[in-house]
């Protein structure tokens, strides 16, 4: 069974796991548009759809989103917009989708606390791909890989 894990958001990622093997991981595809004389990043829906279609995934797992303290309205709107794009693509491609709270997959996979914890755990589970989780900004990749691993274990 091939499972896609998605860390939703502009700094998120998409990972494909089959059994206990990480097949591939991609940063969330984005593009920049100008709005009110400011550059805004948005999810590139066409590229995301291509990646998901090519993955041949039989199911998808996404982290359940919730408001975070101190997060502004604009940030929450952007996150919701990204989630809508992801859910729309998965529905259009007829891929069964499950959302899971962060603590659920983190606890099931024994992920240490903090974003460094997910990078560390992903490198442990997928040592051949450890370099993809090496940088602090690779937390989206590690989260996506772990979410997919959680889904594959179900």
Give residue ranges: language-model regions.
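Phosphate- and other anionic-substrate recognition elements at nucleic-acid/protein interfaces
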Residues: 1-154
């Amino acid at each position: 069974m091939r499972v896609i894990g998605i860390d939703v958001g502009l700094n998120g990622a998409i990972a494909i796991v089959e059994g206990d093997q990480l097949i591939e991981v991609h940063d969330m595809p984005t593009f920049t548009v100008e709005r009110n004389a400011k550059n805004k990043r948005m999810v590139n829906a066409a590229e995301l759809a291509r990646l998901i279609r090519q993955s041949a995934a039989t199911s998808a797992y996404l982290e359940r989103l919730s408001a975070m303290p101190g997060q502004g309205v604009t940030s929450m709107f952007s996150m919701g917009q990204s989630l809508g794009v992801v859910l729309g693509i998965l529905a259009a491609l007829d891929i069964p989708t499950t959302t899971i709270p962060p603590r659920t997959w983190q606890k099931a996979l024994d992920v240490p606390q903090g974003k460094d914890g997910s990078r560390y755990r992903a490198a442990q589970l997928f040592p051949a791909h450890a370099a993809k989780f090496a940088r602090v900004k690779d937390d989206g990749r590690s989260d996506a890989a772990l979410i997919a691993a959680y889904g594959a274990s179900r």
